[in-house]
Regions:
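Conserved alpha/beta-hydrolase
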Residues: 97-114
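Alpha/beta-hydrolase active-site loop
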Residues: 124-143
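Alpha/beta-hydrolase fold nucleophile elbow
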Residues: 145-155
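Short glycine-enriched nucleophile-adjacent loop
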Residues: 158-170, 175
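A catalytic-pocket lid/entrance helix-loop region that shapes and gates access to the active site
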Residues: 171-232
């Protein structure tokens, strides 16, 4: 009889990676997650200070999703601008991770979803604080993943990638911001001009014709609009007539942002039901509701990230509002922040860094995306050897490496692989 060979094992053995994550400074919880793309995937919850300059002011719990390709593989630091919900999907794999067979360290942005402090003190929602969060995660996880690191993000996440580079230059080996704006004010002003030039004259005319038709039929469509908002339980900070106007104005930006096709725009001869269904499908009034999971973004936009305005002049005859000035503050900001001033310090700092320095950055934009109007393409000049710009012809806010024309795509991949050598 071999008695010594009998062992009692735990139901699930903790892997070396899980054990190392659990030993990280300020790690609160490490939870295995299901993945069809990685052998190991975990939710890591860290405790981080609200104010990195004064940790005694309190802390919050910060969610990070770690997807493991190998200790010897490069690591992609995803500088998410919003919540991490989609990163929890079993099939999630970020584009660069797929291309480079790399680990993913996905950082949910502070004040979004599971990384929202309680109480929600808006004072600590700043770009610099979010950059410090990323720097801290980079330092902690760098002990586990000692290879090359690349930071990347999409849209607001792309902006976050660039501001991370601004505050912590050299923290990683390269940066890949996708479709990220660098806005200079609450209503930047460049987007309206962009929308007057984007696409063809026929496409722009089709967009404006639809906006006009929606406004002309206001009396017939408003009962449907009211019923829809009531059924959904939407609450707004402005009268419903103004929300209707804003939806009509938003349509042009949304149309180009998401790469819609002009042949899908209904003719002016369609029924009220057909017109309304397309309208709601294109611009759901949920975007303008009082409180959403993206409220924190609008606080940031109003404080220092900036946003876009609307050109009301072509539609003035049909609008119920005189203009849309200051709509960001009136429609989106919580009541306690209605007097919040915009601070251009962040814009100036990012502009100065991107203009003067030449870090390893690959910027990716879509030519037809309105956010490209306030992007950082201007920072890439012939004298710079490391900063590179790629603009997809006809591309939208959905532009990715995979959507680029093949020669452009190959050049992007070669540049990024060069950082890993």
């Amino acid at each position: 009889m071999v008695l010594a060979a009998v062992f009692v094992l735990p139901a699930v053995a903790r892997t070396p990676l899980q054990q190392r994550l659990e030993k990280l400074e300020r790690a609160i919880e490490v939870t295995p997650l299901e993945s069809t793309r990685f052998d190991e995937k975990y939710e890591l919850v860290l405790r981080q200070p609200l104010d990195w300059q004064a940790p005694e002011k309190g802390s919050f719990t910060h969610r990070i999703v770690v997807s493991h390709a190998g200790f010897d593989r490069p690591t992609i630091l995803v500088t998410e601008g919003y919540g991490a919900k989609y990163a929890y999907r079993p099939d999630y794999r970020e584009e660069l991770s797929q291309l480079l067979d790399a680990n993913i360290v996905f950082v949910e942005h502070r004040y979004f979803l599971g990384s929202t402090p309680d109480p929600r003190d808006w004072h600590y929602l700043t770009a610099e604080a979010s950059a410090c969060d990323l720097h801290d995660v980079r330092q902690l996880l760098g002990a586990i993943y000692p290879g090359k690191w690349i930071a990347t993000g999409i849209s607001k996440g792309g902006t976050t990638t660039m501001l991370y580079a601004t505050f912590f230059p050299g923290d990683v080996d390269g940066y890949v911001p996708y479709v990220g704006p660098v806005n200079r004010s609450r209503e930047d002003g460049r987007h309206e001009k962009f929308l007057r030039r984007v696409g063809t004259a026929d496409e722009r005319a089709a967009v404006e014709r639809f906006q006009t038709e929606v406004l002309r039929r206001r009396d017939r469509l408003m009962p449907r609009f009211e019923a829809y908002c009531r059924e959904k339980g939407y609450e707004f900070r402005a009268p419903l007539t103004e929300i209707y106007d804003l939806c009509a104005l938003e349509y042009a930006f949304s149309f180009w942002q998401w790469g819609s096709n002009s042949y899908e725009i209904p003719a002016t001869s369609v029924t009220d039901d057909e017109l309304f269904d397309y309208f709601i499908g294109a611009v759901d009034p949920e975007y303008f509701v009082r409180e959403t999971p993206t409220t924190s973004f609008f606080v940031q936009a109003a404080r220092e990230l900036g946003y876009y305005g609307y050109d009301t002049r072509p539609l003035r005859k049909y609008l119920s509002i005189r203009n849309s000035k200051d709509y960001l503050r009136r429609i989106f900001l919580p009541d306690e922040l209605r007097d919040l001033d915009f601070d251009r310090t962040l814009y100036r700092r990012m502009h100065r860094y991107l203009k003067r320095e030449d870090p390893n950055i690959v910027m990716i934009y879509g030519a037809n995306d309105p956010w490209t109007a306030s992007g950082a393409a201007w920072a890439v000049t012939p004298r710079k050897r490391n900063m590179k710009l790629f603009v997809q012809p006809g591309g939208s806010h959905r532009t990715r490496i995979a959507t680029l024309p093949e020669p452009m795509r190959e050049e992007v991949i070669a540049a990024i692989r060069g950082w890993l050598e």
